[in-house]
């Protein structure tokens, strides 16, 4: 069976949309192709106001819209026209005056936008639960053998092009039907998520607790890429992205050149980009195996990202080999040249890539170059997920940040202004290092990173070893710990290494002993009251 033999000509279409983007031009093209248009409510008025001939559904069914528009299309003459099997139900349709409807263009009430409003209450949300729309969508998708369903304005042009070629093929109708079921599935999921957070005890109207966890968790992800393999070659893998686009991320980034992203590339790029987003001034983050191995921040007038890259690389040049590099400023040609002439790199990501940088990196065809766009200074709340066997752990994103005024000085000596700058820098980095995490830093450059050890004191030892190996001086540096020190040995070792100031959450049963150790060594120590475990 060829495409030509499965093409479905369209004689009658029903159009009823909440999002009216492109619908006037779409309907005009259909009419030009000889298609009769049925429509409802606001869509009908819009078409008529633009000079497009259409029949109102109420006139076709002989039954008016009622109950403030709750009942418009729920009628046998509508659903019979959509669901009727052309090879089986023709006689029944003719007997009851039901005309075949060959194309349905419907999108649904804006439920998500409605419940996102701060003043939305339960009655408002309920009125924005679409009933007739999903019913028509599902009817048309079920009968895709004989009917085309269009739920996305982005498909209008392709549908018109197919009709001009003689009709929609079965493969095209099947794909449109799949999109339709994905659309209604996501819509029902949003409703269930919202209703699952309603606290009926607050008032008779019911109020959504926007920080609550719904009874069932519904989220839709769309396959963006099939991968050669997963974390290891014997594992199959694909990359799925959230259907609803959020802030700039690895999921929204555009790949400008290079080999296809691997499973590990995506995970590591996410770690690098999310870390570099923490800094307002020009910054560079180099990541290997999801851990920052070098981070630096340099103001524009002191060298910007070009200098920041040099300093980040200097932290651990061995680990930087084959790493991921992220910037929070546009990648310029000079910085790009410094990277490709110095090291092997898997991925470079930045909010923008200059033409000069693209030209430089083009000489290294395998380097993956990603442009992700700008992000807001304020991080948006959201959810983090961790899969366990048979379940899913869900938590709010760790967007906790601290400022100098949030720090609690617990030692006799207060940190200097420069130490405070370095402590906050090191704290931001420690948040993205696998626990137990220790970060040594000076002048907003990491000088040693200890990651992923079962004991915190061993992470501190590794950070010191890394610094020594890189030829970086620990004496005079500061130290950040992602969680509290359970014993004073971590501070004693820091003192021996020459650390002058420490930032940590506090909260240990032995905080007094840890503070005493810092005082004995004249180390300034501050508590954040916030932990940043990362497993």
From Swiss-Prot:
Top-level division of the source organism's lineage: Bacteria
Residue ranges constituting the MGS-like domain according to the UniProt record: 6-151
GO BP field: 'de novo' IMP biosynthetic process
Keywords: Hydrolase, Multifunctional enzyme, Purine biosynthesis, Transferase
Pathway listed: Purine metabolism; IMP biosynthesis via de novo pathway; 5-formamido-1-(5-phospho-D-ribosyl)imidazole-4-carboxamide from 5-amino-1-(5-phospho-D-ribosyl)imidazole-4-carboxamide (10-formyl THF route): step 1/1; Purine metabolism; IMP biosynthesis via de novo pathway; IMP from 5-formamido-1-(5-phospho-D-ribosyl)imidazole-4-carboxamide: step 1/1
Catalytic activity, as annotated: (6R)-10-formyltetrahydrofolate + 5-amino-1-(5-phospho-beta-D-ribosyl)imidazole-4-carboxamide = 5-formamido-1-(5-phospho-D-ribosyl)imidazole-4-carboxamide + (6S)-5,6,7,8-tetrahydrofolate; IMP + H2O = 5-formamido-1-(5-phospho-D-ribosyl)imidazole-4-carboxamide
Entry GO CC: cytosol
Domain notes: The IMP cyclohydrolase activity resides in the N-terminal region.
Protein name per UniProt: Bifunctional purine biosynthesis protein PurH
